[in-house]
C-alpha cells in the first residue's frame, strides 16, 4: 500500500475500522501517539511449524513429521499443535498475527496444514481461523530423499532415490 504520514488509524474490536488524515476518535477511545513509528498490518506466516516443532524444542511436543511412510496425506498438523508453545508469544511480538502450520518436510505428502490465529488458547480449536480451508504439505526434494532413499535412511531400500522418484511417488 501507500505510505501515509500524519495519518490516523481507528481500531475497534481488534479490527481497522477507519484510516485517514481526519479521523475523529469516539469518546473514551484510547489514543496512542505513534509519531516517528511504523504501523503495519499483521504479518501472515504462510509456512510455519510453530506448535508442531516447539520453540524452544521440547521432544515430547515435537510432532512435525509422521515418518511411517513417504505418503501420509491423512494426518493433520492440528492434531499435533501444542498451543502453549512459547514460540507463539515471540511470533506475536514480531507482528505475526496468523499462520499456516504445516507438517514437516520428511514426506512427499506430509499431511494437512491448518490456518491459525495467533491468539492465546488452551486448545488448537480456539486458535483455528474460522472457515479457513485445510491445506496439504508436499516436499519434493532433499528431505524425502534423505529420509527414505539412498538405500539407507530410516527405511533401507525405500523410495524415493531421486526427484524423479519423488514425483512418481
Language-model regions: role of each:
Residues 1, 7, 20, 34, ...:
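Glycine-centered flexibility motif
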Residues 15-18, 36, 56-58, 68-70, ...:
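Glycine-rich loops and low-complexity Gly/Arg-rich segments
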Residues 1-3, 23-25, 67-69, 108, ...:
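A generic structural signal for short, solvent-exposed coil/turn residues
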Residues 13, 25-38, 47, 117-122, ...:
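A signal for specific C-terminal beta-sheet/loop modules enriched in small/flexible residues
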Residues 34-103, 107-111:
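Metal-associated gating/positioning segment near the N- to mid-region
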Residues 1-40, 57:
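Histidine-rich, glycine-flanked metal-binding segment
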Residues 87, 92-169:
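Polyanionic/metal-chelating signatures
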Residues 4-5, 72, 76, 82, ...:
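Generic, ordered loop/turn and secondary-structure boundary motif
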Amino acid at each position: 500500500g501507500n505510505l501515509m504520514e500524519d495519518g490516523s488509524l481507528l481500531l475497534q474490536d481488534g479490527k481497522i475500522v477507519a484510516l485517514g488524515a481526519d479521523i475523529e476518535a469516539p469518546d473514551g477511545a484510547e489514543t496512542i501517539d505513534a509519531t516517528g513509528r511504523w504501523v503495519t498490518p499483521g504479518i501472515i506466516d504462510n509456512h510455519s511449524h510453530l506448535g508442531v516443532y516447539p520453540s524452544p524444542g521440547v521432544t515430547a511436543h515435537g510432532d512435525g513429521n509422521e515418518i511411517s511412510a513417504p505418503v501420509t496425506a491423512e494426518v493433520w498438523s492440528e492434531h499435533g499443535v501444542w498451543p502453549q508453545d512459547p514460540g507463539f508469544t515471540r511470533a506475536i511480538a514480531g507482528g505475526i498475527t496468523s499462520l499456516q502450520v504445516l507438517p514437516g518436510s520428511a514426506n512427499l505428502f506430509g499431511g494437512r496444514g491448518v490456518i491459525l490465529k495467533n491468539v492465546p488458547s488452551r486448545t488448537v480449536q480456539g486458535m483455528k481461523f474460522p472457515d479457513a480451508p485445510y491445506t496439504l504439505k508436499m516436499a519434493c526434494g532433499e528431505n524425502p530423499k534423505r529420509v527414505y532413499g539412498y538405500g539407507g535412511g530410516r527405511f533401507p531400500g525405500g523410495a524415493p532415490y531421486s526427484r524423479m522418484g519423488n514425483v512418481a511417488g
